[in-house]
Every structure is written in C-alpha cells, then in structure tokens.
A protein has these predicted regions:
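Beta-strand->loop->alpha-helix junctions that form or flank phosphate-binding loops
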Residues: 41-42, 173-183, 274-281
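Structural motif
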Residues: 9, 87-89, 118, 150, ...
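Phosphate-binding active sites in nucleotide-utilizing proteins
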Residues: 247-321
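Internal gly/pro-rich beta-alpha loop/helix module
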Residues: 127-241
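C-terminal and late-domain segments of enzyme folds
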Residues: 110, 243-245, 257-267, 274-275, ...
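Residues that mark the start of a beta-strand
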Residues: 7, 35-36, 246-248, 274, ...
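ATP-dependent carboxylate-amine ligase catalytic core
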Residues: 2-113, 117, 121-148, 157-161
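Cysteine-nucleophile active-site neighborhood
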Residues: 299-379
C-alpha cells in the first residue's frame, strides 16, 4: 500500500506544550479554506482525536505503534480518505514512549509514516536554552525529520526576537511561528484530559479562536509546504475482512458514553452489522437488536441522569439476562454494574453485573495493556493475546462478578491483582479498550456472536491467536 497524501506531525517537548492548540487550530483554519484535512492523534486518546475531528469536520482517528502493526498504520492512514493533508498530533514529548528507549513514541510514528515534524516548544521563562532543547531533539535521532519549530507562550516581542535569534544562531530548524501567552485556554480540561468536543458548550467558538490564533501567529503556508514535502510511504497490505453475518447492533452513545474509535464502528459494519445508536440518557427502551456495544466515557459525570433512566436500565438488564450479547469497555463496565459511588452518593446502574464501582480522586489505571485470555468465554478463545489501553479513575470495590475475570494482565491494572475482562453469560465487560485495527478479529467475532443469537444458535466468537 502506498500513501501519497501530504503529511505533517505536530510534536512537543512534553505534555501541555500547545500541540492541540496548533493542531486543532490548523485543522480548522485549513478546513475553512476549503482543504480536506484528515486528522489523527498519535496514541489511543479519544478526546484529542475528537477535538481534531471536530476541527476538520470529519472523523478524528488514532495511529499507535503499540496497538497496530505497520500494515494497520497504513490502513489507518488510508481510512482517513482522500485528503489534501494528513495532520498527526503527537502525544507527550517527541521521544517519550513505553520505555527509556522511547519505544512507540511520536518520533517512531513520524519515521514510520515518513512525515516531517514540527516541534511546539513552550518558551516560558527561557531564551537561549530553548535552542539547546531543540538542537538536542534534532541530534537525538537523525532519522527524525525535525523540519520546523513553533514557539508557544511567548511573553513579549523582545522575548520572541531573542529566542528566534538563539535558535537561528545555533543552526536550528526554522521557527515557523510564535504564539503568545493566552488569557484563557480555549480547550478546558478535567480529570481524563480535555473536556470532550461534544460536551464543550462553545465548541465552535473555541475552534474558531484556535484557528484565528494560528492564522495570526504561525506561517501556515510554510507548514503546508512541509506537509507536501513528505515522500511516498509504503506499507504492507492487510488481508481484507469478509462479512460474517447480518446482525443489528445497538451502540449506546451520548454525552455519558462517547468513546468509540471510528474504525471500530466501521469494522462492525464491514463484518455485516447494521448499527443503531441509542442514548442511555434519553431512551426508555432498547430497540430490537442482536447485540449491544457500550464504549467508554464519563458515566460518573452523568451518573444521576443515567440512574434516572430506570426503564431503559431494566430493559437492557432483562435483555442481557435472556442472552443478548453485550460488549462493554471501561465506562460501559461502570454502567453495567449494580451501583456507582461518586460524589458521596450511590447511583443505581444497569445491574447486569454484580459490581459496585467507586469513582476515585486519582487514576487507577492509565496506559497500555497487554493481556491474555485464560478461560473459556463466548468472545475470545483461550490463549488469545490482546493489546489495548486503559484510563480510568474508578475501581471495583464490591460484588461477586469480579471472580469471573478471564484476562491475565502482563501489563496494566484492570480490575486489580493482574486481572480484567469479566465474562458472565453473553456479557463481556472490562477496563480494556481495544482498537479494531490492532485486534482485527474483534469485529467479526462480535458480529458472529450477534448473528448466532439472531439465528437461535449457541454462538461463539472467533478472536484467536495474537492481537497483532
């Protein structure tokens, strides 16, 4: 597979350096000029990808070398569709990865996709030292095409001039912009990162402000020229996935549960599923479907409203008890439990699983996960290796269904004590988020199980072997 679209990676020295401001602002600015921008987030983060998608007015996608093979990365780029520019926002610092060698870093991804890198540098209370940091990044790996720099949080015109002169005098890459300190951040955050684009009350205003900042303070034409300088990138071809069976799957999606990779939904459809979207905050009953898919999100923020939907919770609980396949991740796990403890109050949830889940002040699980299936279940064959990620501020504090965990974690927190993945009947619930490009057998297995139930067959999944 050959990828020819212009490509650009926006990286930083660290988290909170200003990458999202530049990437989202640039995506919105170019989109408003009539260019088609395919936005990507390096890593598994849903929220940043959502903002990039909102900025570009098309789905924001993820690229991750831990979750995906090079062939899957190529397919991920191809799934962005025909575009005038593929824009990748990095995560953390340019060389920060899984270990001291920077494995699975933004730099590694930039080399794989053959894209020039623009480094966003927070220059707060620094001048010539900025040049040293930039040159250090360039010297760290000569195979990384560090092609330009954008200064962020510049204090004054003099500050900008001194930093520019220091970088140029040291032989650094061109400085392509200087964003001043802002009175307020257009992208506010909360415990899992940014406020989601779907929930931001003034999302469009925030994106237009970001676009205006980029237009005013960054050499946009130079960034476009860099993207167009990216050479063709060759990737191995992936085997196509044939449709499994017709099935109707309900996806529970609204403000409470909004974390779904576009590729996961597309993979389900390609495997034969017809998707119908249902809001657990608004619906009173579950439509006639063959399975339910529940992603992550912020059920703790909307716990009172979820609890108020007693009729829908009862309908879902009765359907699961009758054997309806239900697949849930993270926030979905929390919703399937008996009760959710948050803010000093207890809120009844769906009650499909005997679990009491408590919202915590700090993260209980955050990062990549490596797991292996150790027990029989309808979803994954025993011995299957899975790779995904977790990010949750909650823990299971009670309930008998904890003993039904079928995943052994080689990396990650999950339910605790090295376990995750509760399988009860045809219900699967875990803190583990899977990406369809990293686990290509997942979608066919979900659709097969759903289709088997439709036809009155005792279905079993077909996910087996290694996830990658």
């Amino acid at each position: 597979m050959l990828v020819r679209a212009p490509r650009l990676v926006i990286a930083g020295l660290a988290g909170d350096s200003g990458k999202t401001l530049l990437a989202a602002g640039l995506a919105r600015l170019l989109t408003s000029r009539g260019l088609a921008v395919a936005p990507y987030k390096k890593g598994p983060d849903y929220i940043d990808a959502g903002w990039l998608g909102a900025a570009a007015r098309r789905p924001g996608r993820n690229l991750d070398t831990f979750l995906m093979t090079p062939a899957a990365i190529g397919e991920g780029l191809a799934r962005g569709g025909r575009a005038d520019l593929a824009l990748v926002e990095g995560n953390r610092g340019l060389y920060d990865g899984l270990d001291a060698q920077g494995t699975h870093s933004t730099a590694e991804l930039a080399k794989l996709v053959h894209a020039p890198v623009v480094l966003v540098v927070d220059v707060t209370k620094a001048t010539r030292t900025v040049a040293a940091m930039i040159l250090g990044c360039r010297a760290m790996d000569g195979a990384v095409d560090l092609a330009g720099v954008v200064l962020n949080r510049v204090g004054s015109a003099r500050h900008e001039r001194v930093v520019r002169e220091a970088v140029a005098g040291a032989g650094g890459p061109p400085v392509l912009g200087a964003i001043p300190r802002l009175g307020c951040d257009p992208f506010p955050g909360r415990h899992l990162g940014l406020l989601t684009a779907a929930e931001h009350p003034e999302r469009e205003l925030a994106l237009e402000q970001a676009a205006e900042i980029v237009a005013r303070h960054v050499d946009v034409e130079a960034l476009i020229a860099l993207a167009r300088s990216a050479p063709e990138a060759a990737f191995p071809d992936r085997a196509p996935v044939a449709p499994v069976a017709p099935a109707k799957i309900a996806v529970l999606r609204d403000e409470a549960l909004s974390f779904y990779y576009p590729e996961n939904l597309e993979a389900l459809e390609e495997a034969g599923a017809e998707l119908t979207f249902v809001s657990p905050l608004a619906a009173r009953e579950l439509p006639e479907v063959d399975a339910v898919y529940i992603g992550g999100g912020f059920p703790e923020v909307h716990a009172e409203r979820l609890a108020a939907g007693a009729a829908f919770r009862r309908d879902l609980r009765e359907a699961a008890a009758a054997g309806l396949p239900v697949y849930a991740e993270c926030g979905g796990l929390m919703y399937l439990g008996k009760e959710l403890l948050t803010g000093g109050a207890s809120h009844p949830m769906a009650g499909i699983l005997d679990l009491t889940i408590e919202q915590t002040a700090g993260p209980r699980g955050h990062g990549y996960v490596s797991a292996r299936v150790e027990a029989e279940n309808p979803w994954f064959e025993r011995g299957t290796a899975l790779r995904g990620h977790e990010f949750h501020y909650s823990r299971v504090v009670g309930g008998g269904d904890r003993s039904g965990a079928v995943l052994r974690l080689d990396r990650g927190t999950g339910l605790g004590e090295g376990r995750d993945g509760i399988a009860v009947g045809n219900v699967w619930a875990s803190y583990l988020h899977l990406h369809a490009l990293g686990t290509p057998g997942w979608a066919p297995a979900v659709v097969a199980l759903a289709g088997a139930g439709r036809n009155g067959i005792s279905g079993r999944a077909t996910v087996s072997g290694r996830a990658r």
